[in-house]
UniProtKB/Swiss-Prot annotation:
Gene: SSN8
Gene3D superfamilies hit by this protein: Cyclin-like (1.10.472.10)
Cellular-component GO terms for this entry: nucleus
GO BP annotations listed: regulation of transcription by RNA polymerase II
Protein name as annotated: RNA polymerase II holoenzyme cyclin-like subunit
Described purpose of this protein according to its UniProt entry: Component of the SRB8-11 complex. The SRB8-11 complex is a regulatory module of the Mediator complex which is itself involved in regulation of basal and activated RNA polymerase II-dependent transcription. The SRB8-11 complex may be involved in the transcriptional repression of a subset of genes regulated by Mediator. It may inhibit the association of the Mediator complex with RNA polymerase II to form the holoenzyme complex. The SRB8-11 complex phosphorylates the C-terminal domain (CTD) of the largest subunit of RNA polymerase II.
Length: 304
């Protein structure tokens, strides 16, 4: 266990470059194409003919590939939040669960595991690691109340999956988040040198951006403080009007003196912009229907 990000397994074992991350994704993509060449047959409602039509979605399309399907990524984000809020689980544990999910799905396909059971297990493990453990039966009961078709009543299924999850994570379970960096940034900005106090509205918006960033790959690529600074810069640009030149100047001076890599900051901002662009097109009915067909192999709700 490491109290410092700089000495942590997160930095030394689970931090990728953009090139190495792309290679990992490509390896999984090729494996999926080999294992599931038949694609997925789904029932689609043809509005013109006003009837149900069965069609095949080739495995080479982006659907159900976690690295390419933003619909799936956003849906996973909502699944974690929904179960977490039912049990009043701390935000830190929920985002740790999301990091576990991202790491796991870098090495395993959604097509070969039960996504709903995976998410339940990620939350169960994250709560133990973040020292806010949940009773396994309570967690499984809540998960079953949300997704009864996909979560088995046998709690040992979660404990079995937990061993599989830990193995894929190589037992590196400590995750450092940008929230602590944000606290340090807030304290530094309020010092006499910068004389800038972040408002409650600014802090809330930065927190929201950090929360949403877990839907992207930035936590596999960059240090927590870089993500926190990127979200600070984004909120500063949104909130402060051109006439607030002093406030912008103080924040820009702070960012410059941190010597953070501005290319990384720009990439994180681009990832967030791309995420929100896809969020506007989010189609929950479609992804739910695809997963229903994938896991249950029976009549599915029509995809609108």
């Amino acid at each position: 266990m490491s109290a410092s990000y700089w000495d942590s397994s997160q930095r030394h074992k689970w931090k990728y470059t953009r090139e190495s991350l792309a290679k990992e994704k490509q390896k999984l993509w090729l494996l999926e194409c080999q294992l599931f060449p038949q694609g997925l047959n789904v029932t689609i409602h043809d509005s013109k003919a006003n009837k149900q039509v069965t069609t095949n979605i080739p495995v080479t399309q982006r659907d159900l590939h976690y690295d390419r399907d933003y619909n799936l990524r956003i849906y996973c984000y909502f699944l974690i939040m929904k179960l977490g809020r039912r049990l009043n689980i701390r935000q830190c544990a929920l985002v740790t669960a999301h990091v576990y999910l991202s790491r796991f799905l870098l090495r395993a396909s959604v097509r070969e595991v039960n996504l709903y059971l995976l998410i339940t297990t990620c939350i169960y493990l994250a709560c133990k690691v973040e020292e806010c453990p949940q009773h396994i039966r309570t967690l499984v009961n809540e998960a079953r109340s949300l997704w009864p078709e996909f979560i088995p009543p046998d709690v040992t299924k979660v404990t079995e999956f937990e061993f599989y999850l830990i193995e894929e994570l190589q037992s590196y379970l400590i995750v450092h988040h940008p929230y602590r960096s944000l606290e340090q940034i807030e304290k530094a900005l309020s010092s006499e040198k910068y004389n800038y106090k972040l408002s409650d509205d600014e802090l809330q918006k930065i927190w929201s951006l950090i929360n949403d960033s877990y839907t992207t790959d930035v936590h596999l690529l960059y240090s927590p403080h870089v993500i926190a600074i990127s979200c600070l810069f984004a909120v500063s640009c949104i909130i402060h009007k051109p006439e607030d030149s002093t406030k912008r100047a103080n924040i820009n001076m702070f960012i410059a003196e941190t010597q953070v890599n501005l290319e990384q900051v720009m990439f994180i901002l681009q990832e967030l912009i791309s995420l929100y662009d896809h969020w506007d097109k989010y189609n929950e009915l479609r992804i739910r229907a695809l997963l229903h067909e994938l896991y249950l192999r029976q009549q599915t709700p029509a995809i609108q």
